[in-house]
């Protein structure tokens, strides 16, 4: 398969009097020919890459199949490109994966919808290879193509393909076939539908677990397209077979089928047909099956019916919370708030809370972390009084957990508790723990506390905040971790927005300015960052009297990093100075001279940032 990329011979025009001035139209034609030749050469290169020994080049070429097909034209794309691709099935898996993904995109380049079935041949072969990822992509692409077909093509081309795969000698083809039954089921007549149900049932009973796993995945979708009659006579029996399969890898997939069936049945039918299988799966001998039930429990409850949940499933959920496997308890802990919505307050207090108290002290840190992340969801359900009485002690205990993720998860959801019990009570109850966590050895915990502080500021008031939390906020500026120092500067800006610029001047800025004289250059650097970050929240007079002199004073610092950050800070300050008449003259009198001096600095980085800031400063015009 080749593309003719040889240059075309230009048409020669014979003229008696040839003007020495080039004809623009002729030049346009020449350029067009040249561009066309370049395009053909590019396509030829792509075709060569399809056969190249370098795997990555073959992958790249497969990603450009539509370009190749467009250049070849419909006939050659059908008769040459697709057969060539079909012959490439023995390639590396990464090439085949891209090929399986790109083949459906060729349908617009084949010359009409009647040629779409041509794409089935290579995809059928891809659906039978050993690599599961490639097979899954091929099945996805086959479903895509089937959706583009008319009913005649589905019956005459697609259905025979599925039958061949379903009856294939190798389990790989049979596993792929399972995922193709639902896509065209409704387009078939009753006789063909019955044939497909029988074929699918054979796959459900296949001797190979991998095939049965595929049918378990596919039955969920098939349950959504069969008639009500066949849901009862066909889907439910197959579900029960799979739910009692001897392989746990098959059984764990059936919870999704149960949900799909429950969505189509009424509450009474769900009670009669699905309740016992659900309970059986929830106490399955394999922990992976119980884990799947626990992780989907709220979704099951949403579909199976509220009355059934309250009457039949409370104890089932409690058993999952007490499961002997940590992974199951972790999954169940994540479902606590969602399941609690189906239960009354008495049930929560009598049945769930004892389990939750045990989980707070669970030996598995992941269980405690999952509980910490979701326990706050009980607050809106229990209300203020019961939250204070029953949940606050558990929050405090989790805040003191030795595992940092547990502490982080509680902090991340304090806002939900705050909405129920109010910030005053929350701060009084949790402030000692918050103060302790502010010095936590894990920097991520300290970061979470910093980000929560502004939410406490307004409700606590200035006096309480200054007395209990101000020193803490200032101490973070000297933290050994950069992310903490950065968050601390943003925190001070937010606090200034809450308490006002005068508060910042009297309490914060004076302490920041003292850091400019610290022997440790990191403190001096933090001074620049903090003042620059806070600028937007400060008044022009404070910038003029405190911020600018401090920044200018550091322009002669012996550390180059300090000096070029001074230049960057002055660049940031310039717009703020320009906005007010009382400070606009400082640009020419103070900022520009300082920057001019820095442009002659011996350090290249300092000169660069100073020059950039100087250009910006000189462009600024005082506002009138």
Model-found features: residue ranges?
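Extended, low-complexity, acidic/polar intrinsically disordered regions
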Residues: 1-624
């Amino acid at each position: 398969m080749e593309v003719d990329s040889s240059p075309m011979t230009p048409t020669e025009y014979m003229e008696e009097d040839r003007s020495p001035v080039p004809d623009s139209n002729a030049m346009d034609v020449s350029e067009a020919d040249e561009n066309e030749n370049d395009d053909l050469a590019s396509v030829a290169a792509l075709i060569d890459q399809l056969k190249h020994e370098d795997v990555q080049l073959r992958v790249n070429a497969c990603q450009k199949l539509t370009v190749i097909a467009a250049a070849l034209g419909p006939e050659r794309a059908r008769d040459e490109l697709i057969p060539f691709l079909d012959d490439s099935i023995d390639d590396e898996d990464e090439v085949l994966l891209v090929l399986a993904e790109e083949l459906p995109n060729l349908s617009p380049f084949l010359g009409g919808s009647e040629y779409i079935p041509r794409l089935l041949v290579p995809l059928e072969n891809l659906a039978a290879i050993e690599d599961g990822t490639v097979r899954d992509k091929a099945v996805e692409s086959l479903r895509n193509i089937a959706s583009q077909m008319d009913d005649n093509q589905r019956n005459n081309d697609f259905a025979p393909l599925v039958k061949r795969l379903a009856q294939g000698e190798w389990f790989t083809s049979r596993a792929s076939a399972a995922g193709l039954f639902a896509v065209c089921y409704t387009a078939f007549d009753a006789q063909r539908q019955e044939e497909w149900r029988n074929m699918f049932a054979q796959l459900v009973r296949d001797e190979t677990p991998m095939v049965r796993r595929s049918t378990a995945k596919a039955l969920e979708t098939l349950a959504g397209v069969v008639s009500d009659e066949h849901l009862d006579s066909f889907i439910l029996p197959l579900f029960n077979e799979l739910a009692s399969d001897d392989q746990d890898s098959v059984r764990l997939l059936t919870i999704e089928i149960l949900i799909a069936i429950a969505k189509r049945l009424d509450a009474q039918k769900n009670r009669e047909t699905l309740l016992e299988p659900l309970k059986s799966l929830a106490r399955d001998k394999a922990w992976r099956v119980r884990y799947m039930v626990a992780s989907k429990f709220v979704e099951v409850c949403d579909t199976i019916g509220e009355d059934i949940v309250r009457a039949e499933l409370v104890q089932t959920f409690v058993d999952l919370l007490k499961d002997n496997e940590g992974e199951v308890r972790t999954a169940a802990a994540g479902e606590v708030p969602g399941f609690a919505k189906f239960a009354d307050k008495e049930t929560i207090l009598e049945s769930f809370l004892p389990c939750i108290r045990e989980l707070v002290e669970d030996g598995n840190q992941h269980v405690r972390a999952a509980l910490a992340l979701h326990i706050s969801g009980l607050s809106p359900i229990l209300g203020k009084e019961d939250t204070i009485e029953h949940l606050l002690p558990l929050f405090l205990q989790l805040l003191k957990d030795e595992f940092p993720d547990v502490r982080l998860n509680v902090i991340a959801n304090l806002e939900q508790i705050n909405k129920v019990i109010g910030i005053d009570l929350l701060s009084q109850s949790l402030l000692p723990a918050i103060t302790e966590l502010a010095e936590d050895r894990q920097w991520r915990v300290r970061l979470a506390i910093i980000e929560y502080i502004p939410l406490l500021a307004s409700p606590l008031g200035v006096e309480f905040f200054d007395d209990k939390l101000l020193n803490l906020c200032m101490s973070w500026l000297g933290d050994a971790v950069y992310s903490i120092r950065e968050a601390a500067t943003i925190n001070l800006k937010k606090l200034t927005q809450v308490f006002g610029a005068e508060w910042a001047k009297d309490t914060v800025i004076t302490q920041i300015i003292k850091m400019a004289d610290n022997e440790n250059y990191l403190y001096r650097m933090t001074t620049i960052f903090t003042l620059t970050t806070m600028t937007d929240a400060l008044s022009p007079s404070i910038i003029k009297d405190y911020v600018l002199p401090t920044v200018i004073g550091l322009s002669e610092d012996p550390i180059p990093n300090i000096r070029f950050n001074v230049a960057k800070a002055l660049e940031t300050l310039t717009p703020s100075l320009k906005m007010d008449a009382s400070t606009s003259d400082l640009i020419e009198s103070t900022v520009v001279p300082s920057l001019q001096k820095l442009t002659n600095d011996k350090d290249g980085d300092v000169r660069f940032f100073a020059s950039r800031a100087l250009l910006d400063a000189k462009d600024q015009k005082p506002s009138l």
